[in-house]
Swiss-Prot record:
Residues 353-366, 367-374 dip into the membrane without crossing it. Its main location: membrane. One of its GO terms (molecular function) is voltage-gated potassium channel activity involved in cardiac muscle cell action potential repolarization. It comes from Mus musculus. Disulfide bonds: none annotated. This is A-type voltage-gated potassium channel KCND3. Two N-terminal domains regulate binding to and modulation by KCNIP1. GO terms for cellular component: dendrite; GABA-ergic synapse; Kv4.3-KChIP1 channel complex; membrane; postsynaptic specialization membrane; sarcolemma; voltage-gated potassium channel complex.
Length: 655
């Protein structure tokens, strides 16, 4: 048995690893290559970003641009690809829609730009996935509300020259700040609204007793004065209503509006009182009708942005308010019924009927608790507690929604006002720029350039130059003046804070640069003045005249206190060799290009020079590696020489 196992075991192992086939029949053929052909792979170039996909992927939606034959208009024969000059970031979402069948909205994209891209590719926004559709609709609604006022203002401003008299009047009523007359009428109507409301309140106040009569209110005691005030207010309100009705774009819509109804209700009691007789039967109805005069206070909504925002909030929260009213109605009916049957057995109970129990339920659910109706039984007290707790929950749930809507609308109005103010300021600046001449613009430009230069330098010489010459000419001359000094001479500046070495070259080559840096460090200075030393461009000895260009000439500045040996050593450390440079004329310089005719200089622009400036900035001894080994500096005195310190070398090349 063991011998038989040993005989076939190697063959089984060999077959397992593929050395010997186990089956005698041949293996079936491999499946045919079902991959897509190479010509079905298309390239979509969107603003330089290349996307590759299969043609059948795009043909899934033939009603769109990429799925129809219209995309052939965008085919480039040279590159063999479809080119679209569109946003590549949004196209990524579009291409994923063709691949997966689900359209998503990226939150970082502008909603208007996203809609434009979808409209270009022929994709409906309604097919956005459920995961992104709510976010898309919210962003779209917020954007529409934010831009509504801006579009209205733009349309009004664009059509201002062609406005008729009625349109101008309506625009003045809706936006009083368009003209002075509209603003005056706006404040006059606001004043009379306040007077009317105060009159309606004060006329009910008792004004004392008259001998032989009972106490009378002020409205009856001073009836003539109050009648005149009421007449004046009603006349103003009537004129305003008639003018608004005349100027309204749609009179039918204006009459149906809420503010129009408030205006009619506010002035109607006065005219009804004029035509009514002194009949006692109708006097009660007239008194009831006078109550509607209090609606004049709602006319303040035209003069208060906060009241308008509150009205918009209540209008936008109509569904939440309807839910609140429905919930309260259900709870009131349920708890009023329960309280009636719970207190029915008590003899001193005030819950005589279910409608009578409504009052207790409303007061309890709104957490007022007047105490005029109180349950006496144990069951009534328990149900009263449950009624109070349920009222808190029912009322508190819709309140955050209302508050959030109010905050949203308020901030939108704030941003709209800010945008209108910014746009008004921009239009004013553009108007000034258009009305101003080109010379005025150039003059302001020159002033701006000179102010920037004076802020950087702040030297008296430049200020004097700006006063005597043209601003741009002065700056250009100053630039060429500095360039001439740099290209014409090789300076060794003994400034304690700044050392500059320049040389003029045409054909140059660099030599031992490390040796130059080492020697330049050894030749730095250590005396630090209390004030900032002037630069080459602002030195008194250099700004008044233009120096001639000489090759490899060294000038020692007045504030130098280096010994002659050190000056000689720094002269020998030039990193640039001049090969075959011509000596320019001593009377010609680049700065003479902008000099006046009386300077007597002729321009010479035949040669071009390359300038290399080596700027050495000294560093304190404590910051240098060998600062610790050097002796401390002696106290300064009249005959004391301060040793030099190590410096950092910065090379600057300029044309």
């Amino acid at each position: 048995m063991a011998a038989g196992v040993a005989a076939w075991l190697p063959f089984a192992r060999a077959a397992a690893i593929g050395w010997m086939p186990v089956a005698n029949c041949p293996m079936p053929l491999a499946p045919a290559d079902k991959n897509k052909r190479q010509d079905e792979l298309i390239v979509l170039n969107v603003s330089g970003r290349r996307f590759q996909t299969w043609r059948t992927t795009l043909e899934r939606y033939p009603d769109t641009l990429l799925g129809s034959t219209e995309k052939e208009f965008f085919f480039n024969e040279d590159t063999k690809e479809y080119f679209f000059d569109r946003d590549p970031e949004v196209f990524r979402c579009v291409l994923n829609f063709y691949r997966t069948g689900k359209l998503h909205y990226p939150r970082y994209e502008c909603i208007s730009a996203y809609d434009d891209e979808l409209a270009f590719y022929g994709i409906l926004p309604e097919i956005i996935g459920d995961c992104c559709y709510e976010e898309y609709k919210d962003r779209k609604r917020e954007n529409a509300e934010r831009l509504m006022d801006d579009n209205d203002s733009e349309n009004n401003q664009e059509s201002m020259p062609s406005l008729s008299f009625r349109q101008t009047m309506w625009r003045a009523f809706e936006n009083p700040h368009t003209s002075t007359l509209a603003l005056v009428f706006y404040y006059v109507t606001g004043f009379f609204i306040a007077v009317s409301v105060i009159t309606n309140v004060v006329e009910t106040v008792p004004c004392g007793t008259v001998p032989g009569s009972k106490e009378l209110p002020c409205g009856e005691r001073y009836s003539v004065a109050f009648f005149c005030l009421d007449t004046a207010c009603v006349m103003i309100f009537t004129v305003e209503y008639l003018l608004r009705l005349f100027a309204a774009p749609s009179r039918y819509r204006f009459i149906r509006s809420v503010m129009s109804i408030i205006d009619v209700v506010a002035i109607m009691p006065y005219y009804i009182g004029l035509v009514m007789t002194n009949n006692e039967d109708v006097s009660g109805a007239f008194v009831t009708l006078r109550v509607f005069r209090v609606f004049r206070i709602f006319k303040f909504s035209r003069h208060s942005q906060g009241l308008r925002i509150l009205g918009y909030t209540l209008k936008s929260c109509a569904s939440e308010l309807g839910f609140l009213l429905f919930s309260l109605t259900m709870a009131i009916i349920i708890f009023a019924t329960v309280m009636f049957y719970a207190e029915k057995g008590s003899s001193a109970s005030k819950f005589t009927s279910i409608p009578a129990s409504f009052w207790y339920t409303i007061v309890t659910m709104t957490t007022l608790g007047y105490g005029d109706m109180v349950p006496k039984t144990i069951a009534g007290k328990i149900f009263g507690s449950i009624c109070s707790l349920s009222g808190v929950l029912v009322i508190a749930l819709p309140v955050p929604v209302i508050v959030s809507n109010f905050s949203r609308i308020y901030h939108q109005n704030q941003r709209a006002d800010k945008r209108r103010a910014q746009k008004k300021a921009r239009l004013a600046r553009i108007r000034v720029a258009k009305t101003g001449s080109s010379n005025a613009y150039l003059h302001s430009k020159r002033n701006g350039l000179l102010n920037e230069a004076l802020e950087l330098t702040g030297t008296p010489e430049e200020e004097q130059m700006g006063k005597t010459t043209s601003l741009i000419e002065s700056q250009h001359h100053h630039l060429l003046h500095c360039l001439e000094k740099t290209t014409g001479l090789s300076y060794l500046v003994d400034d304690p804070l700044l050392s500059v070495r320049t040389s003029t070259i045409k054909n140059h080559e660099f030599i031992d640069e490390q040796m130059f840096e080492q020697n330049c460090m050894e030749s730095s200075m250590q005396n630090y003045p209390s004030t900032r030393s002037p630069s080459l461009s602002s030195h008194s000895g250099l700004t008044t005249t233009c120096c001639s260009r000489r090759s490899k000439k060294t000038t020692h500045l007045p504030n130098s206190n280096l010994p002659a040996t050190r000056l000689r050593s720094m002269q020998e450390l030039s990193t640039l060799h001049i090969q075959g440079s011509e000596q320019p004329s001593l009377t010609t310089s680049r700065s003479s290009l902008n000099l006046k005719a009386d300077d007597g200089l002729r321009p010479n622009c035949k040669t071009s020079q390359i300038t290399t400036a080596i700027i050495s900035i000294p560093t304190p001894p404590a910051l240098t590696p060998e600062g610790e080994s050097r002796p401390p500096p002696a106290s300064p005195g009249p005959n004391t020489n301060i040793p030099s310190i190590t410096s950092n070398v910065v090379k600057v090349s300029a044309l």
